[in-house]
Protein backbone atom coordinates (compact mmCIF):
# COMPACT_ATOMS: atom_id res chain seq x y z
CA UNK A 1 0.00 0.00 0.00
CA UNK A 2 1.47 3.34 -1.06
CA UNK A 3 2.09 6.03 1.50
CA UNK A 4 -0.19 9.06 1.65
CA UNK A 5 1.18 12.49 0.90
CA UNK A 6 2.60 13.98 4.14
CA UNK A 7 0.89 17.34 3.52
CA UNK A 8 -2.42 15.53 3.03
CA UNK A 9 -1.88 13.56 6.25
CA UNK A 10 -1.51 16.78 8.28
CA UNK A 11 -4.18 18.62 6.30
CA UNK A 12 -1.92 21.53 5.31
CA UNK A 13 -0.84 23.06 2.02
CA UNK A 14 2.63 22.60 0.56
CA UNK A 15 3.35 26.25 1.35
CA UNK A 16 2.41 25.84 5.02
CA UNK A 17 4.66 27.51 7.57
CA UNK A 18 6.40 25.68 10.40
CA UNK A 19 3.85 27.02 12.88
CA UNK A 20 0.95 25.79 10.74
CA UNK A 21 2.54 22.36 10.48
CA UNK A 22 3.15 22.24 14.23
CA UNK A 23 -0.43 23.27 15.06
CA UNK A 24 -1.82 20.65 12.67
CA UNK A 25 0.41 17.99 14.23
CA UNK A 26 -0.59 18.91 17.79
CA UNK A 27 -4.28 18.77 16.89
CA UNK A 28 -4.08 15.42 15.09
CA UNK A 29 -1.68 13.77 17.56
CA UNK A 30 -4.13 14.53 20.37
CA UNK A 31 -7.02 13.23 18.26
CA UNK A 32 -5.42 9.89 17.39
CA UNK A 33 -3.15 9.28 20.40
CA UNK A 34 -3.69 5.67 21.65
CA UNK A 35 -4.12 6.91 25.22
CA UNK A 36 -7.08 9.05 24.16
CA UNK A 37 -8.59 7.43 21.06
CA UNK A 38 -9.50 3.76 21.51
CA UNK A 39 -11.03 3.35 18.04
CA UNK A 40 -9.59 0.73 15.70
CA UNK A 41 -6.94 2.17 13.40
CA UNK A 42 -6.18 5.20 15.56
CA UNK A 43 -2.74 3.80 16.42
CA UNK A 44 -1.78 3.58 12.74
CA UNK A 45 -3.12 7.08 12.08
CA UNK A 46 -1.09 8.40 15.04
CA UNK A 47 2.07 6.83 13.61
CA UNK A 48 1.27 8.26 10.16
CA UNK A 49 0.78 11.77 11.60
CA UNK A 50 3.99 11.50 13.60
CA UNK A 51 5.99 10.31 10.57
CA UNK A 52 4.65 13.19 8.47
CA UNK A 53 5.52 15.76 11.15
CA UNK A 54 9.05 14.41 11.64
CA UNK A 55 9.70 14.96 7.93
CA UNK A 56 7.94 18.28 7.35
CA UNK A 57 9.22 19.93 10.55
CA UNK A 58 12.83 19.37 9.49
CA UNK A 59 13.97 21.82 6.77
CA UNK A 60 16.41 19.38 5.16
CA UNK A 61 14.02 16.42 5.21
CA UNK A 62 11.15 18.59 3.94
CA UNK A 63 13.24 19.91 1.04
CA UNK A 64 14.24 16.36 0.13
CA UNK A 65 10.62 15.18 0.38
CA UNK A 66 9.36 18.08 -1.78
CA UNK A 67 11.88 17.07 -4.45
CA UNK A 68 11.72 13.28 -4.33
CA UNK A 69 8.53 12.42 -2.45
CA UNK A 70 8.65 9.08 -0.65
CA UNK A 71 11.40 7.83 -2.96
CA UNK A 72 14.84 7.59 -1.36
CA UNK A 73 17.13 9.73 -3.56
CA UNK A 74 20.09 7.62 -2.47
CA UNK A 75 18.64 4.57 -4.19
CA UNK A 76 19.32 5.92 -7.66
CA UNK A 77 17.49 3.76 -10.18
CA UNK A 78 17.29 0.76 -7.86
CA UNK A 79 14.21 -1.44 -7.97
CA UNK A 80 13.41 -0.43 -11.55
CA UNK A 81 13.83 -3.81 -13.22
CA UNK A 82 17.62 -4.22 -13.22
CA UNK A 83 17.58 -7.23 -10.93
CA UNK A 84 16.94 -5.58 -7.56
CA UNK A 85 18.77 -3.17 -5.30
CA UNK A 86 20.28 0.24 -5.77
CA UNK A 87 23.46 -1.14 -7.35
CA UNK A 88 21.74 -2.59 -10.46
CA UNK A 89 21.73 -6.21 -9.26
CA UNK A 90 23.67 -8.43 -11.68
CA UNK A 91 25.74 -5.58 -13.10
CA UNK A 92 27.06 -4.49 -9.71
CA UNK A 93 27.64 -0.81 -8.97
CA UNK A 94 29.10 1.64 -11.50
CA UNK A 95 31.83 2.28 -8.92
CA UNK A 96 32.90 -1.34 -9.25
CA UNK A 97 32.81 -1.28 -13.05
CA UNK A 98 34.81 1.88 -13.56
CA UNK A 99 37.23 1.15 -10.75
CA UNK A 100 37.98 -2.24 -12.29
CA UNK A 101 38.59 -0.70 -15.70
CA UNK A 102 40.50 2.39 -14.66
CA UNK A 103 42.10 1.03 -11.49
CA UNK A 104 42.16 2.40 -7.99
CA UNK A 105 39.12 0.60 -6.58
CA UNK A 106 36.06 2.20 -5.08
CA UNK A 107 36.07 2.82 -1.37
CA UNK A 108 33.81 0.48 0.55
CA UNK A 109 32.93 0.56 4.21
CA UNK A 110 35.02 -1.83 6.25
CA UNK A 111 32.58 -4.35 7.78
CA UNK A 112 34.86 -4.68 10.79
CA UNK A 113 35.15 -0.92 11.40
CA UNK A 114 33.50 0.48 14.55
CA UNK A 115 29.93 1.68 13.91
CA UNK A 116 27.58 3.67 16.09
CA UNK A 117 24.55 1.84 17.46
CA UNK A 118 21.02 2.60 16.33
CA UNK A 119 18.96 5.35 17.97
CA UNK A 120 15.87 4.48 20.01
CA UNK A 121 12.63 6.39 20.53
CA UNK A 122 10.33 6.39 23.55
CA UNK A 123 6.99 8.24 23.86
CA UNK A 124 6.24 9.67 27.31
CA UNK A 125 2.86 11.05 28.33
CA UNK A 126 2.96 14.05 30.70
CA UNK A 127 0.27 15.96 32.52
CA UNK A 128 -0.14 19.65 31.73
CA UNK A 129 1.58 20.60 34.99
CA UNK A 130 4.45 18.12 34.57
CA UNK A 131 5.26 19.62 31.18
CA UNK A 132 5.19 23.13 32.63
CA UNK A 133 7.40 22.46 35.65
CA UNK A 134 9.49 19.46 34.56
CA UNK A 135 10.20 16.35 36.60
CA UNK A 136 12.56 13.47 37.23
CA UNK A 137 11.34 10.21 35.74
CA UNK A 138 12.53 6.63 35.43
CA UNK A 139 11.60 4.92 32.19
CA UNK A 140 12.08 1.33 31.10
CA UNK A 141 12.98 0.58 27.50
CA UNK A 142 13.73 -2.64 25.61
CA UNK A 143 17.11 -2.55 23.93
CA UNK A 144 19.94 -4.81 22.83
CA UNK A 145 22.94 -5.18 25.10
CA UNK A 146 26.18 -7.10 24.88
CA UNK A 147 25.72 -10.75 25.84
CA UNK A 148 27.23 -11.35 29.27
CA UNK A 149 27.79 -15.06 28.57
CA UNK A 150 30.11 -14.59 25.57
CA UNK A 151 31.03 -10.93 26.24
CA UNK A 152 29.67 -9.97 22.84
CA UNK A 153 31.79 -12.35 20.75
CA UNK A 154 28.88 -14.62 19.82
CA UNK A 155 31.04 -17.69 20.42
CA UNK A 156 30.45 -20.36 23.03
CA UNK A 157 32.54 -19.74 26.18
CA UNK A 158 35.91 -21.45 25.81
CA UNK A 159 35.88 -21.03 22.01
CA UNK A 160 36.71 -18.13 19.72
CA UNK A 161 35.33 -16.72 16.51
CA UNK A 162 37.60 -17.46 13.56
CA UNK A 163 38.56 -15.33 10.62
CA UNK A 164 36.30 -16.18 7.69
CA UNK A 165 38.18 -18.53 5.40
CA UNK A 166 36.23 -17.39 2.35
CA UNK A 167 36.84 -13.63 2.49
CA UNK A 168 39.96 -13.58 4.65
CA UNK A 169 38.24 -11.37 7.21
CA UNK A 170 37.44 -8.54 4.79
CA UNK A 171 33.71 -9.29 4.76
CA UNK A 172 33.71 -9.06 0.95
CA UNK A 173 34.15 -11.47 -1.92
CA UNK A 174 35.54 -10.66 -5.36
CA UNK A 175 33.23 -12.01 -8.05
CA UNK A 176 34.22 -11.94 -11.72
CA UNK A 177 31.42 -10.84 -14.03
CA UNK A 178 30.96 -10.15 -17.70
CA UNK A 179 29.67 -6.68 -18.60
CA UNK A 180 29.37 -4.59 -21.76
CA UNK A 181 32.83 -3.26 -20.83
CA UNK A 182 34.37 -6.72 -20.59
CA UNK A 183 35.13 -8.86 -17.59
CA UNK A 184 35.31 -7.00 -14.33
CA UNK A 185 35.73 -7.95 -10.72
CA UNK A 186 32.80 -6.96 -8.56
CA UNK A 187 33.00 -6.92 -4.77
CA UNK A 188 30.07 -8.37 -2.88
CA UNK A 189 29.25 -8.89 0.77
CA UNK A 190 30.52 -12.30 1.82
CA UNK A 191 27.51 -14.58 2.13
CA UNK A 192 29.38 -17.00 4.41
CA UNK A 193 29.97 -14.53 7.24
CA UNK A 194 27.30 -11.94 6.29
CA UNK A 195 30.00 -9.29 5.97
CA UNK A 196 31.36 -9.65 9.52
CA UNK A 197 34.66 -11.20 8.45
CA UNK A 198 34.27 -13.84 11.15
CA UNK A 199 32.97 -17.39 11.39
CA UNK A 200 31.56 -18.91 14.56
CA UNK A 201 31.65 -22.70 14.63
CA UNK A 202 30.28 -23.01 18.17
CA UNK A 203 27.67 -20.35 18.83
CA UNK A 204 26.80 -19.00 22.26
CA UNK A 205 23.63 -20.67 23.52
CA UNK A 206 22.44 -17.47 25.21
CA UNK A 207 22.51 -15.10 22.23
CA UNK A 208 22.57 -17.61 19.37
CA UNK A 209 25.82 -16.20 18.00
CA UNK A 210 24.67 -12.59 17.63
CA UNK A 211 26.67 -11.36 20.63
CA UNK A 212 23.62 -9.38 21.80
CA UNK A 213 20.59 -10.02 23.99
CA UNK A 214 17.43 -7.98 24.38
CA UNK A 215 16.82 -6.60 27.87
CA UNK A 216 14.67 -4.01 29.58
CA UNK A 217 16.82 -1.14 30.77
CA UNK A 218 15.81 1.43 33.39
CA UNK A 219 16.98 4.96 32.61
CA UNK A 220 16.65 8.10 34.72
CA UNK A 221 15.49 11.08 32.66
CA UNK A 222 15.45 14.73 33.69
CA UNK A 223 12.53 16.45 31.94
CA UNK A 224 13.18 20.20 31.68
CA UNK A 225 10.47 22.69 32.61
CA UNK A 226 8.56 24.06 29.63
CA UNK A 227 8.53 21.07 27.28
CA UNK A 228 5.60 21.09 24.87
CA UNK A 229 3.58 18.47 23.05
CA UNK A 230 5.56 16.85 20.22
CA UNK A 231 8.96 18.03 21.43
CA UNK A 232 11.69 15.49 22.06
CA UNK A 233 14.59 15.12 24.48
CA UNK A 234 17.87 13.54 23.43
CA UNK A 235 19.55 11.26 25.98
CA UNK A 236 23.07 10.64 24.67
CA UNK A 237 24.48 7.13 24.72
CA UNK A 238 21.27 5.35 25.76
CA UNK A 239 20.42 3.84 22.38
CA UNK A 240 21.45 0.47 20.97
CA UNK A 241 25.06 -0.61 21.65
CA UNK A 242 27.68 0.10 19.01
CA UNK A 243 29.05 -2.47 16.58
CA UNK A 244 32.69 -3.57 16.63
CA UNK A 245 33.47 -1.32 19.55
CA UNK A 246 31.65 1.71 18.15
CA UNK A 247 29.77 4.20 20.36
CA UNK A 248 26.17 3.50 21.38
CA UNK A 249 23.27 5.32 19.74
CA UNK A 250 21.06 7.89 21.46
CA UNK A 251 17.62 7.70 23.02
CA UNK A 252 15.01 10.24 21.92
CA UNK A 253 12.14 10.78 24.36
CA UNK A 254 9.09 12.25 22.57
CA UNK A 255 6.56 14.02 24.79
CA UNK A 256 2.79 13.82 24.57
CA UNK A 257 1.18 16.42 26.85
CA UNK A 258 -2.38 15.83 28.05
CA UNK A 259 -4.82 18.73 27.75
CA UNK A 260 -6.06 20.64 30.83
CA UNK A 261 -9.71 21.20 31.72
CA UNK A 262 -9.20 24.91 32.45
CA UNK A 263 -5.93 26.08 30.90
CA UNK A 264 -4.84 26.13 27.27
CA UNK A 265 -1.28 26.62 26.14
CA UNK A 266 0.24 28.35 23.13
CA UNK A 267 4.02 28.31 23.26
CA UNK A 268 5.02 29.70 26.65
CA UNK A 269 1.74 31.55 27.23
CA UNK A 270 -1.27 30.22 29.13
CA UNK A 271 -4.88 31.11 28.25
CA UNK A 272 -8.08 30.72 30.26
CA UNK A 273 -11.62 32.08 30.53
CA UNK A 274 -13.02 33.55 33.76
CA UNK A 275 -16.79 33.81 34.34
CA UNK A 276 -18.17 37.00 35.91
CA UNK A 277 -21.63 37.66 37.23
CA UNK A 278 -23.61 40.55 35.81
CA UNK A 279 -23.09 42.46 39.08
CA UNK A 280 -19.31 41.88 39.08
CA UNK A 281 -19.00 43.08 35.50
CA UNK A 282 -21.18 46.14 36.05
CA UNK A 283 -19.88 47.24 39.45
CA UNK A 284 -16.33 45.92 39.28
CA UNK A 285 -14.76 43.45 41.71
CA UNK A 286 -11.54 41.84 42.87
CA UNK A 287 -11.51 38.17 41.88
CA UNK A 288 -9.14 35.24 42.37
CA UNK A 289 -7.72 33.74 39.20
CA UNK A 290 -6.21 30.22 39.19
CA UNK A 291 -2.71 30.04 37.68
CA UNK A 292 -0.12 27.29 37.44
CA UNK A 293 1.71 29.10 40.23
CA UNK A 294 -1.26 29.46 42.60
CA UNK A 295 -4.20 31.84 42.93
CA UNK A 296 -3.67 35.49 41.96
CA UNK A 297 -5.97 38.43 42.73
CA UNK A 298 -7.18 40.45 39.74
CA UNK A 299 -9.04 43.77 39.87
CA UNK A 300 -11.91 43.90 37.39
CA UNK A 301 -12.99 47.49 36.65
CA UNK A 302 -16.64 48.50 36.60
CA UNK A 303 -18.29 48.17 33.20
CA UNK A 304 -16.15 45.24 32.05
CA UNK A 305 -17.57 43.62 28.91
CA UNK A 306 -17.56 40.01 27.74
CA UNK A 307 -14.37 39.36 25.78
CA UNK A 308 -12.25 41.83 27.77
CA UNK A 309 -8.70 40.50 28.08
CA UNK A 310 -6.33 40.76 31.02
CA UNK A 311 -2.70 39.68 31.26
CA UNK A 312 -0.80 38.32 34.24
CA UNK A 313 2.86 38.87 33.41
CA UNK A 314 5.23 36.00 34.17
CA UNK A 315 2.46 33.58 35.12
CA UNK A 316 2.88 31.40 32.05
CA UNK A 317 5.33 28.58 31.34
CA UNK A 318 9.09 28.80 31.65
CA UNK A 319 10.80 28.74 28.26
CA UNK A 320 12.36 25.31 27.76
CA UNK A 321 15.58 26.89 26.48
CA UNK A 322 15.77 29.34 29.36
CA UNK A 323 14.60 32.43 27.45
CA UNK A 324 12.35 33.94 30.10
CA UNK A 325 8.80 33.10 31.14
CA UNK A 326 5.45 33.30 29.39
CA UNK A 327 2.34 35.19 30.55
CA UNK A 328 -1.19 34.14 31.45
CA UNK A 329 -3.99 35.68 29.39
CA UNK A 330 -7.51 35.87 30.82
CA UNK A 331 -10.65 36.39 28.74
CA UNK A 332 -13.74 37.52 30.68
CA UNK A 333 -17.14 35.95 30.01
CA UNK A 334 -20.16 37.63 31.61
CA UNK A 335 -22.64 34.95 32.64
CA UNK A 336 -26.31 35.73 32.08
CA UNK A 337 -28.33 34.62 35.14
CA UNK A 338 -30.89 31.85 34.69
CA UNK A 339 -33.65 30.36 36.87
CA UNK A 340 -34.37 33.74 38.45
CA UNK A 341 -36.76 34.07 41.37
CA UNK A 342 -39.72 36.41 41.12
CA UNK A 343 -37.98 38.87 43.42
CA UNK A 344 -34.84 38.86 41.26
CA UNK A 345 -36.91 39.42 38.14
CA UNK A 346 -38.64 42.41 39.75
CA UNK A 347 -35.29 43.93 40.69
CA UNK A 348 -33.98 43.55 37.12
CA UNK A 349 -37.19 45.06 35.71
CA UNK A 350 -36.81 48.05 38.02
CA UNK A 351 -33.19 48.37 36.96
CA UNK A 352 -34.27 48.33 33.30
CA UNK A 353 -36.86 51.03 33.97
CA UNK A 354 -34.34 53.23 35.72
CA UNK A 355 -31.53 52.74 33.22
CA UNK A 356 -33.73 52.63 30.15
CA UNK A 357 -33.57 50.09 27.35
CA UNK A 358 -31.22 52.11 25.17
CA UNK A 359 -27.63 50.85 24.98
CA UNK A 360 -24.87 53.10 26.26
CA UNK A 361 -22.28 54.83 24.06
CA UNK A 362 -19.97 51.84 23.93
CA UNK A 363 -22.80 49.54 22.86
CA UNK A 364 -24.01 52.16 20.36
CA UNK A 365 -20.67 52.12 18.62
CA UNK A 366 -20.98 48.34 18.30
CA UNK A 367 -24.51 48.56 16.89
CA UNK A 368 -23.40 51.26 14.46
CA UNK A 369 -20.78 48.85 13.13
CA UNK A 370 -23.42 46.16 12.70
CA UNK A 371 -25.71 48.55 10.80
CA UNK A 372 -22.87 49.63 8.51
CA UNK A 373 -22.02 45.99 7.85
CA UNK A 374 -25.59 45.28 6.74
CA UNK A 375 -25.55 48.37 4.50
CA UNK A 376 -22.25 47.28 2.97
CA UNK A 377 -20.48 50.44 4.05
Curated annotation (Swiss-Prot):
The gene is dnaJ. GO terms for cellular component: cytoplasm. NCBIfam families: DnaJ_bact (TIGR02349), PRK10767.1 (NF008035), PRK14276.1 (NF010869), PRK14280.1 (NF010873). It holds the Pfam family DnaJ_CXXCXGXG. Its cofactor is Zn(2+). InterPro entries: DnaJ, DnaJ_C, DnaJ_domain, DnaJ_domain_CS, HSP40/DnaJ_pept-bd, HSP_DnaJ_Cys-rich_dom, HSP_DnaJ_Cys-rich_dom_sf, J_dom_sf. Homodimer. A zinc finger (CR-type) spans 134-216. PROSITE patterns: DNAJ_1 (PS00636), DNAJ_2 (PS50076), ZF_CR (PS51188). The keyword ATP-binding does not apply. CXXCXGXG motif repeats lie at residues 147-154, 164-171, 190-197, 204-211. Zn(2+) 2 binds at residues 164, 167, 190, 193. This is Chaperone protein DnaJ. Disulfide bonds: none annotated. Gene3D superfamilies: DnaJ domain (1.10.287.110), Heat shock protein DnaJ, cysteine-rich domain (2.10.230.10), Urease metallochaperone UreE, N-terminal domain (2.60.260.20). Binds 2 Zn(2+) ions per monomer. Its main location: cytoplasm. It is found in: Cytoplasm. One of its GO terms (molecular function) is heat shock protein binding. Belongs to the DnaJ family. GO terms for biological process: chaperone cofactor-dependent protein refolding; DNA replication; protein refolding; response to heat. Participates actively in the response to hyperosmotic and heat shock by preventing the aggregation of stress-denatured proteins and by disaggregating proteins, also in an autonomous, DnaK-independent fashion. Unfolded proteins bind initially to DnaJ; upon interaction with the DnaJ-bound protein, DnaK hydrolyzes its bound ATP, resulting in the formation of a stable complex. GrpE releases ADP from DnaK; ATP binding to DnaK triggers the release of the substrate protein, thus completing the reaction cycle. The keyword Repeat applies. Zn(2+) 1 binds at residues 147, 150, 204, 207. Residues 5-69 form the J domain.
